[in-house]
Regions:
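Helix-breaking motifs and short loop linkers at transmembrane-helix boundaries and internal kinks
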Residues: 41, 75, 96-102, 129-130
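Cytoplasmic helix-loop-helix junction between adjacent transmembrane helices
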Residues: 106-144
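Extracellular/periplasmic helix-loop-helix junction of adjacent transmembrane segments
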Residues: 32-62
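Interfacial helix-cap and linker-helix signal at transmembrane-aqueous boundaries
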Residues: 36-37, 70-71, 155-162
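Conserved MFS/SLC helix-loop-helix module at the cytosolic interface between two early adjacent transmembrane helices
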Residues: 62-98
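Residue-level signature of mid-helix packing/kink "hotspots" within the transmembrane helices
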Residues: 27, 57-65, 115, 149-150
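Extracytoplasmic
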Residues: 10-44
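Glycine-rich segments within core transmembrane alpha-helices of 12-TM secondary carriers
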Residues: 135-156, 160
C-alpha cells in the first residue's frame, strides 16, 4: 500500500485524526473550569486558572523549536505515536487528579507532549506529498486542528452540563 497513489492521503487522514485530538483535549479545559472547581477549589481563583492555562502555552511555545529538532533526529512516525500516547494518558490523569498541583504538573507535561506533534506531523506530510499536492495535504490536515478546537469546546460544555 505504501507505493499506491492513495497512501499519501491515508497518511493525511490518519494525521487529521491525531490533529483533531491534539487540539480537542487542550480546548476542553477552558470550558470545564466550573466543573473542575467543584473538586479542586484552587481553580475558583481566576489567577490560578490563568496559571494553569498559561503553563501549557508557555511550555508548548518554548518546546516547539526543540520539538522540531527532535523530529529531525528521530523516527517521526514513532514520535507522533509516543506523543499521542503521552497526551492521551495525561488527559486521563487530569480527569482523576485531586489537587491543583497535580493538574498544573499534568498540564505542563501535556504542553511538552503536544508540542512534539505538529513539527513531526507536518514534516511527515511533506515526505509523502510532492509540490503538486503538499499545500492541499497540509490544508486538509489543518482542518483537523480547527475541528478539534470546535469539538473540544462543545464537548466540554456538554460534559460540564452532566
Amino acid at each position: 500500500m505504501k507505493n499506491s497513489k492513495i497512501y499519501p492521503w491515508v497518511v493525511v487522514g490518519l494525521l487529521w485524526g491525531v490533529a483533531l485530538l491534539n487540539y480537542m483535549d487542550r480546548q476542553m479545559l477552558s470550558t470545564m473550569r466550573d466543573a473542575m472547581a467543584v473538586d479542586i477549589t484552587e481553580l475558583q481563583s481566576a489567577a490560578n486558572f490563568g496559571r494553569l492555562m498559561g503553563v501549557f502555552l508557555w511550555i508548548y511555545g518554548c518546546m516547539s523549536p526543540i520539538a522540531g529538532m527532535v523530529g529531525d533526529r528521530m523516527n517521526r512516525k514513532w514520535l507522533i505515536v509516543g506523543s499521542l500516547f503521552v497526551w492521551s494518558a495525561v488527559t486521563y490523569l487530569m480527569g482523576i487528579a485531586d489537587t491543583y498541583n497535580e493538574v498544573f504538573f499534568l498540564r505542563a507535561l501535556m504542553g511538552i507532549s503536544e508540542a512534539l506533534y505538529i513539527p513531526a506531523g507536518l514534516s511527515l506530510i511533506a515526505d509523502y506529498h510532492s509540490d503538486k499536492s503538499r499545500s492541499l495535504a497540509i490544508g486538509i490536515h489543518m482542518t483537523g486542528l480547527y475541528t478539534g478546537q470546535a469539538l473540544g469546546g462543545f464537548g466540554a460544555t456538554i460534559a460540564g452540563a452532566y
